Amino acid sequence: MSILDIFKSVDINKEVNRCRTTKGSVLLAVRTEGEYRQGHIGGSRNIPVEKIDNAVNLLHDKSAPIFVYCQSGSRARKAASKLRKLGYVEVYNIGGFEQYQGQLQRGKR
């Protein structure tokens, strides 16, 4: 993470659209399973931040673009940093679910 990451404003709505148009990308929610079931962005996968070390078992392609979000942005920042340390090369912290304006899905998927 660079100093610019701290001050850069990210529009989760634009980033979700970018994810959906980027070939092979993964939209990753690092919220708790309960938060995810209550509402999530369609097409996202859920790996709670405390289980992010297990990502290597679920996200096999370390070169695939990964767009990470959480509730407010802080867990996404932590997870994105950890994913980079695990060898994932194209990881984007797209911020917090609170700012998302699109339609939500409920339940596990």
Model-derived segments and their meaning:
Residues S2-R18, T22-S25, E33-A64, S74-R109:
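Rhodanese-like catalytic fold shared by cysteine-dependent sulfurtransferases
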Residues A29:
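N-terminal glycine-rich beta->alpha transition that marks the start or flank
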Residues Y69:
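Short, surface-exposed ligand- or partner-binding patches at beta-edge/loop junctions that are enriched
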